[in-house]
Amino acid sequence: MPKIELSSKWSCDGRELKPKSGATSQNTWVYDGRYLKPKFSATSKNTWVYDGHELKPQFSANSQNSWVIEGNKIKPQFSSNSSNTYEFNGHSILVAFGQVVLKLW
């Protein structure tokens, strides 16, 4: 089972996820305890909702683009298996979001 890892090129304090070099409000993601969204120009189409159990797009969410959190694991709601189920490995939901949803690294 793969593990969530924060790329050495990114930083995250639990509230903001941004590149270590060249960070701007346009490539920084923020988490306010419910929503994960770009720091600048957030819309319902690029905002995700996290309720403590599911991570899904605010707009047009379905079982194929939603993730389920169970204990210290995050996995796709649909067709999950050992290769697409990740251990949080001590990282926040924002780091997991950057790795498995946005695929930033």
Task: Please name every model-derived segment.
Residues 1-105:
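Repetitive, compositionally biased segments used for assembly/scaffolding
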